[in-house]
């Protein structure tokens, strides 16, 4: 059974989730809501993308709806999630990708319109967070609102799980070298809460905060309080990289650690955790479906208990694919797929 999904918020993640769904045989997007984009503009934004290229399919506007590859996608422009008629569209699940309704209470408004479950495509202060390949099997059908966590947590957590399961992480620090995003400025502008964050994204490396490392403790409870981190926003349009430095209890050579990650990437974490010994750079991974691609050549170890590991991720495409994978998984548990 195909999982019927609605998207609220047709920004970067909303549109990339839609594009991913076209390639995902188990998901059908039946409705989109965005109060700030009318249907013709939505069709244009879906068709043309500066980062991921032109949409490989047919997009038309039919009245107030979109027709994508011959299938009707209902389009609404409601500001209040409670007013979106999800039940009329057939959308059982909703991807909440506005970045606004990220708490359980706010996201639950979608249920008033007939949706049964909401997946927030961002970290949440109170909704349970899931990372595919790490803790997705803890999902229970009585959960109505859940979070797919962040793109960085989706990169970090699978790698941390492999290392912790094999060698036991004592403590660690993470830095994500992160491509700029829509929250940043094209030219210097006001940013009262984060002065450096207001500087132009295309000219600067900007130190910033991130909760991604601490969030790993929510999806891997044994690591709660053992990891923290920061971000460096850099002048690249897409694809980011995690630098994880950890002390491990059970000593291992760097070659042994590489082998452990390689085995996991070919086994239980296949499709989620990747492994490469190629001399890759950011653009080589644009459009990569995986959550985390371990760079075997980029890491180093000081000794058998202190190691730096490097793993790449497409912070748009790979993350959006995991949103859909999570939807398909919970639909199976719910008996709807």
Curated annotation (Swiss-Prot):
The keyword Oxidoreductase applies. Signal peptide: none annotated. D-glyceraldehyde 3-phosphate binds at residues 150-152, 181, 210-211, 233. NAD(+) binds at residues 12-13, 34, 79, 315. The record marks 178 as: Activates thiol group during catalysis. Keywords: Cytoplasm, Glycolysis, NAD, Oxidoreductase. GO terms for biological process: glucose metabolic process; glycolytic process. Homotetramer. This is Glyceraldehyde-3-phosphate dehydrogenase. The lineage of its organism: Eukaryota, Fungi, Dikarya, Ascomycota, Pezizomycotina.
């Amino acid at each position: 059974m195909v999982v019927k999904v609605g998207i609220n918020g047709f920004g970067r993640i909303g549109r990339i989730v839609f594009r991913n769904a076209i390639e995902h045989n188990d998901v059908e997007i039946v409705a989109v809501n965005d109060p700030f984009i009318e249907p013709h503009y939505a069709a244009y934004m879906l068709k043309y993308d500066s980062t991921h290229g032109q949409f490989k399919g047919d997009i038309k506007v039919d009245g107030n709806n979109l027709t994508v590859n011959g299938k009707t996608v209902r389009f609404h422009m409601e500001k209040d999630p409670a007013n979106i008629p999800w039940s009329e569209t057939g959308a059982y699940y909703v991807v909440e990708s506005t970045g606004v309704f990220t708490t359980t209470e706010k996201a639950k408004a979608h249920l008033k319109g007939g949706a049964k479950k909401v997946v927030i495509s961002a970290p949440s202060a109170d909704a349970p967070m899931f990372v595919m390949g790490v803790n997705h099997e803890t999902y229970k059908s009585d959960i109505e609102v859940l979070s797919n966590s962040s793109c960085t947590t989706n990169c970090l957590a699978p790698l941390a799980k492999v290392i912790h399961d094999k060698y036991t992480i004592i403590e660690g620090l993470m830095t994500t070298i992160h491509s700029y995003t829509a929250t940043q400025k094209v030219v210097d502008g006001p940013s009262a809460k984060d002065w450096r964050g207001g500087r132009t994204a295309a000219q600067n490396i900007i130190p910033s905060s991130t909760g991604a490392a601490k969030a790993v403790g929510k999806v891997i409870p044994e690591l709660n309080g053992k990891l923290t981190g920061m971000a460096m926003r850099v002048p690249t349009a897409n694809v980011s990289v995690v630098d994880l430095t950890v002390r491990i209890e059970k000593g291992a050579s760097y070659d042994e650690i590489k082998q452990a990650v390689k085995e996991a990437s070919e086994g239980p974490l296949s499709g989620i955790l990747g492994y490469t010994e190629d001399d890759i750079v950011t653009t080589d991974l644009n459009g990569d479906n995986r959550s985390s691609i371990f760079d075997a050549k980029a890491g180093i170890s000081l000794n058998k208990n202190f190691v730096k590991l490097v793993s790449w991720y497409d912070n748009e495409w790979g993350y959006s694919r995991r949103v859909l994978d999570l939807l398909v998984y919970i639909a199976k548990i719910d008996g709807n797929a």
